[in-house]
Amino acid sequence: MKSVLVVGLGRFGRHVAMKLDELKHEVMAVDIQEDRVDAALPYVENAQIGDCTNAEFLSSLGVRNFDVCIVAIGDNFQSSLETTSLLKELGARFVVSRAARDVHAKFLLRNGADEVVYPERQLATWTAVRYTADHILDYIELNEEYGIFELTVPAEWAGKSVGQLDVRTVSYTHLRAHET
């Protein structure tokens, strides 16, 4: 179990906090809007109303004690950048920040983010691949060249060994199968 600070409780931050709770992690959530904090109370250990661009407030949360700090602010890049930078200055161990554009990611990485996520881009890629390719049930992009696919077995593959399929001549592919 990890302790996670989620800053920003818009759609993305709220869903991250809910999933972390479902995975049994300890979650503290922070947002400047009281209604968002109130809505998060059922699925977080602790929730605070406050401005995370304020160093004193952010310091009062004990950011050094969290395994991961997730900056989920999506509607105000300046606040996201300031919060990311302050978290690192205050000793946060690992900071993940949300970006909408590559230029945002560059600034976030230069100012303290250990990693950057692009929720809209990542979901758009998953949706496009998942719903336009035959046999794909799920997809995880590892980088621009590699991905992991869960797929149904095409009829023409049934009863054949991996060697008989010769998938490596089509692309650099590794298969791992399991019965369900």
Where are these regions (language model features)?
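Glycine-rich Rossmann-fold phosphate-binding loop(s) that bind the pyrophosphate
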Residues: 9
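N-terminal Rossmann-fold NAD(P) dinucleotide-binding loop
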Residues: 13
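Short beta-strand element of Class I
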Residues: 27
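Short alpha-helix immediately C-terminal to the canonical SAM-binding loop
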Residues: 37-38, 105
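Conserved small/polar residues in nucleotide/adenosyl-binding loops
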Residues: 173-180
